[in-house]
Regions:
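Conserved, mostly hydrophobic/aromatic
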Residues: 25, 61, 102, 228, ...
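Conserved phosphate-handling catalytic cores of large alpha/beta enzymes
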Residues: 311, 610-639
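Flexible glycine/proline-rich, aromatic-decorated loop/lid segments
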Residues: 196-200, 238-252, 260-293, 299-320, ...
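Short beta-alpha connecting loops at secondary-structure transitions
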Residues: 49-54, 79, 118-128, 161-165, ...
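Cofactor-cradling patches in redox/metallo enzymes
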Residues: 528-623
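Catalytic alpha/beta active-site cores
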Residues: 1-217, 235-238, 242-249, 277, ...
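Short beta-strand/loop segments at the ligand-binding rim of alpha/beta enzyme cores
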Residues: 1-2, 245-248, 517-520, 580-590
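Flexible, glycine-rich loop/tail regions that form catalytic "lids" or insertion modules at the edges
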Residues: 300-301, 305-312, 316-503, 551, ...
Length: 640
């Protein structure tokens, strides 16, 4: 299966993109949804401002889903949907549109990501607390096994764990403990007869990562295969070897893609793809590759085509697929696999002893482990122990002709997309049968308060025109919302005090003494290592809430991290809000995937400093933040 992860702006524009990609030889679809859709908000919600259509396509109701798949027969398509907290809702919309096209749900093929554990640990698009979230997953798996048997209702994602810093051992162990939590919940719900439980196991799929250390990554995949076979046989009694098969798709690593010398990302992507294709016994069933310029911004269709062609050259020009497993019998490979399996088993047992994956999320254990691993990785890069070509070694370069016109080297989203989506959803609400909508939402809430399966009530909501925000809002009233542990503490991931960090800590301490107290920073993990008192209230805050927190906590600097492309809308709002609150002397610093032209505009709007992926040295960043604070207070930035 060859796919590219795609979707942006609107359902209509994304549909055109999908049909172009299919015409180029893509064999399936991988749908990216925007953040409001992922987190259960409509485009006119205050929390959706600046985010509509940015990192994916907005789907607010069945009308949007119809537009998304116009002239694409869903009965013949294999569609992967990267959706988690609202996965049940998007599957209901997909099924409803497929039925309108005349397709039998029993023939539908595809995947919903639906792994909420990794949302608490990495991506952050959770909505409900772990218990109700696991109930939604359980209901959805039980429904699909009985009604959409070719569907993969959950794609357990070790991919995002690696992006959040996981080592290969942590990636294996936390994915397996997530799978155990899900399978135990389905088994204990009684919705699937014991004799048919093998069908549930057979539909569990995984979405993994593959880094540039491709030999170790290939061994990791073989370790995954071995452990999954053991767990499904021993814990769940599945005797059919086919049902125990480790089924996985992959997107290779994005964390390691660099803004500096981004042309080097192509060879990184190729090496990472080899990790999941070289070994036949552990080969991915579906592969999607990131684009070379993802560290710069949203890739263009041409960039996605390049990634697709890489797969096609490997599949159709090389001889890799003509051979059995070329590593079978290798003592080196078998030794590394055994090492990974042993260490992963130990970590699985540690998490299970805590009460399982959900308990390890609620206690903050898993998050702390990932934060510590990621901090260690960053420290190795800063120290030069881990070489990143073009970043901390071999950083002299010729001019890159691919970047001569940087504004055309990335895809941008029209500023009118959001206003059009807001107008469209208001029109949608005005034209539907409101009585039917109210009745469907009332039934949804009633069922949510019982142990009945929620899928039927969700389908009813989809068919009468309920919106994404209304469906999620109704369940928020029953289940509540969740704010996951940050994993940030004074003892997690604190760096060793090398010469540069010692100098930063001295600057922080001296500046604090000059200003009459310890420096206080709103948001921002790196401040801990430098000696800042960090105020971090989690994700998903409006500009007004950020300003209110800055006022309440009397901070010296506000740090904003925005990776979705909404920096041009949201950051100026924070700067204006601080000024209106009388905090003109509180500088704002911003980090994210921000093109140079946007960075210049933000600085003109009053932002003190802009950091992008090329700024890999966290210690140097913190030194610049201290200098920014000193400048804002009329102190010599070089004196501390």
């Amino acid at each position: 299966m060859m796919r590219t992860y795609a979707g942006h702006s609107s359902a209509k524009e994304s549909n055109e993109l999908y049909r172009r990609n299919l015409a180029k030889g893509q064999t399936g679809l991988s749908v990216a949804f925007d953040l409001p859709t992922q987190t259960g908000y409509d485009p006119d919600s205050e929390l959706a401002r600046g985010e509509v259509g940015k990192v994916g396509v907005p789907v607010s109701h069945i009308g949007d889903m119809r537009a998304l798949f116009t002239d694409i027969p869903l009965g013949e398509m294999n569609t992967s949907m990267t959706i988690n907290a609202t996965a049940m809702w998007l599957l209901a919309l997909y099924q409803a549109v497929a039925e309108e096209q005349g397709a039998d749900p029993a023939v539908l093929q595809g995947t919903t990501q639906n792994d909420i554990i990794k949302e608490y640990l990495s991506r952050g698009t959770y909505v409900f607390p772990p218990g109700p979230s696991l109930r939604l997953i359980t209901d959805m798996i039980s429904y699909t096994v009985n009604n959409i048997p070719k569907w993969n209702p959950i794609n357990i994602c070790s991919y995002h764990l690696q992006e959040a810093g996981a080592t290969p051992v942590q990636e294996i162990a936390y994915a397996m403990t997530t799978a155990i939590a899900v399978l135990d919940s389905v088994r204990d719900s009684g919705q699937v007869p014991e004799a048919e439980f093998g069908k549930v196991v057979a539909r569990i799929s995984f979405f993994v990562n593959a880094g540039v250390r491709f030999v170790e990554e290939m061994c990791k995949m073989r370790a995954f295969v071995q452990l999954w076979d053991e767990i499904t046989a021993e814990r769940y009694g599945v005797t059919d070897a086919k049902q125990r098969r480790f089924r996985y798709g992959v997107q290779v690593n994005s964390l390691g893609l660099t803004e500096a010398q981004p042309e080097n990302n192509i060879q990184r992507i190729v090496l990472e793809m080899l990790a999941v294709t070289l070994s036949k016994d552990a080969r991915a069933r579906a592969v999607q590759l990131p684009a070379w310029n993802e560290a710069l911004g949203l890739p263009r269709p041409w960039d996605q085509q390049w990634s697709l062609r890489i797969q096609q050259v490997l599949a159709f020009e090389s001889d890799l697929l003509e051979y059995d497993d070329i590593f079978s019998g290798s003592a080196v490979i078998e030794g590394k696999v055994a090492e990974l399996v042993t260490a992963a088993r130990e970590e699985i047992e540690r998490v299970q002893a805590m009460g399982g994956a959900v308990a390890a999320v609620e206690s903050g254990y898993m998050k702390q482990q990932l934060v510590a691993s990621h901090a260690a990785r960053r420290a190795r890069i800063e120290a030069g122990d881990d070489i990143v070509v073009g970043v901390n070694r071999f950083d002299t370069t010729e001019e890159n002709p691919l970047l001569t016109d940087l504004d055309s080297a990335i895809q941008t989203v029209d500023a009118e997309v959001e206003s059009a989506a807001v107008a469209a959803i208001r029109q949608w609400r005005a034209q539907r049968d409101q009585e039917a909508v109210s009745a469907a939402l009332e039934e949804l809430q009633q069922v949510a308060g019982t142990d009945q399966n929620l899928m039927a009530a969700t389908l009813a909501c989809a068919r009468v025109g309920v919106t994404t925000g209304e469906w999620a809002g109704a369940l928020r009233e029953v289940f509540g919302e969740y704010r996951a542990p940050t994993g940030v503490s004074g003892v997690v991931g604190v760096a060793e005090a090398g010469q540069a960090l010692t100098a930063v800590r001295h600057s922080v301490r001296t500046t604090g003494e000059e200003l009459g107290g310890r420096l206080r920073m709103l948001v921002g993990k790196p401040g801990l290592d430098a000696g800042f008192e960090v105020i971090y209230q989690g994700i998903r805050l409006t500009p007004a809430q950020i300003v209110a927190a800055a006022v309440a906590e009397d901070v010296h600097v506000v740090g904003l991290s925005i990776l979705s492309g909404s920096h041009m809308e949201l950051v100026p709002d924070v700067v204006r809000g601080l000024a209106e609150a009388g905090l003109d002397d509180v500088p704002v610093v911003v980090g994210g995937i921000i093109p140079d032209a946007d960075a210049d505009t933000l600085r003109s709007a009053g932002v003190a400093a802009v950091f992008t992926p090329k700024d890999y040295d966290a210690t140097a960043i913190m030194q610049q933040v201290v200098a920014t604070i000193r400048t804002a207070h009329g102190l010599d930035p070089q004196a501390a």
